[in-house]
């Protein structure tokens, strides 16, 4: 039976193992949200992953919500990412760019004084990440129906720029309470147009963005990231199994490369149902160990497993897992911020 160390084909991509590096925001980009040499070194250190899913990368300046996260809308950003992908490919790795719009999870200080946008003008609970002094999230501005085409186009251009930058494919960030998730889940979408109300309407934007990426890349080089638990950024849905199963089925009809779901083990996990509904390669994510990951593969609950924090602290994670070697302890105080400390200085075996 397959283990996480065995190769797999996800869509059009052949992977050397099933150990996926999960998307991890690290806030190390240069001015203008341009990827830099430090980021290239960080990813190269982790090129032994079967596939790297890049940190979330904004498709438009109005889609940012954190300091020093990268973008993919400018020529300078494309050039910066090109250096990253060349280095990763030189080290034998493969990488998809995660395309991102934060929606309401932002603040005017990141948006040139503008309000964040969202499906509906519903203020999220909580404080803006990494802004001091602490500031509540503002009430966002509801997007006009006519503006939604521009959002889809921003994702399309982001997908085109990702191709120009040399990525192996793209992953649509539809998780964790960001814009596409806000449209999808019932608690954050009170629209009465074609993008709200029914489940089909709430899922429309995510699927139209996915279709735009498919037009650029082909379905075999597009993945989608989901988070059915709704445990980030004040989310919630009236029937998460129905909602996310519908999305999985629709994505399955499109034949995309994979879905990756932040849906950890547990009696309430709907990961196996999503895999069945999707019918294609399913990447499980969150708090998996070597043993639990292999168990999910053996039980047919997943086809690959994405690791997040373990990859932060262990650049050589696949080798450590295979050797049953001890793992480095992560240092959360350096997860976000400038410089190499806690970024490229974790030891390898």
Regions of interest found by a model, annotated:
Residues 1-349:
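Flavin-dependent oxidoreductase catalytic cores
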């Amino acid at each position: 039976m397959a283990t996480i160390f065995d190769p797999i084909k996800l869509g059009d991509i052949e992977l050397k193992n099933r150990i996926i590096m999960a998307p991890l925001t690290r806030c190390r980009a240069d001015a203008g949200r341009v990827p830099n040499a430090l980021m290239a070194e960080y990813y190269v250190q982790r090129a032994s992953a079967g596939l790297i899913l890049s940190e979330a990368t904004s498709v438009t300046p109005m889609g940012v919500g954190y300091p020093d996260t990268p973008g993919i809308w400018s020529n300078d950003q494309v050039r910066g990412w090109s250096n990253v992908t060349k280095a990763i490919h030189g080290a034998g790795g493969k990488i998809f760019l995660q395309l991102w719009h934060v929606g309401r999870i932002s603040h005017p200080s990141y948006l040139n004084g503008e309000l964040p946008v969202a499906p509906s003008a519903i203020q999220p609970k909580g404080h803006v990440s990494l802004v001091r002094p602490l500031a509540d999230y503002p009430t966002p501005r509801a997007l006009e129906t006519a503006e939604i085409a521009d959002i889809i186009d921003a994702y399309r251009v982001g997908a085109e720029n990702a191709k120009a930058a040399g990525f192996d494919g793209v992953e649509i960030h539809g998780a964790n309470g960001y814009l596409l998730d806000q449209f999808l889940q019932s608690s954050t979408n009170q629209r009465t147009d074609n993008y709200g109300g029914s489940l089909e309407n709430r899922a429309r934007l995510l699927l139209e963005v996915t279709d735009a990426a498919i037009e650029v890349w082909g379905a075999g080089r597009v993945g989608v990231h989901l988070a059915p638990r709704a445990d980030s950024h004040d989310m919630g849905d009236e029937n998460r199994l129905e909602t996310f199963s519908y999305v999985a089925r629709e994505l399955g009809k499109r034949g995309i490369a994979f879905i990756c779901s932040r849906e950890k083990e547990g009696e309430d996990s709907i990961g196996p149902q999503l895999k069945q509904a999707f019918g294609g390669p399913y990447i499980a994510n969150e708090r998996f160990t070597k043993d639990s990951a292999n168990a999910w593969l053996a039980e047919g609950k997943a086809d690959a497993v994405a690791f997040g924090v373990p990859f932060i602290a262990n650049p050589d994670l696949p080798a450590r897992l295979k050797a049953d070697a001890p793992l480095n302890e992560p240092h959360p105080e350096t997860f976000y911020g400038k410089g190499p400390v806690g970024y490229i200085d974790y030891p390898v075996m």
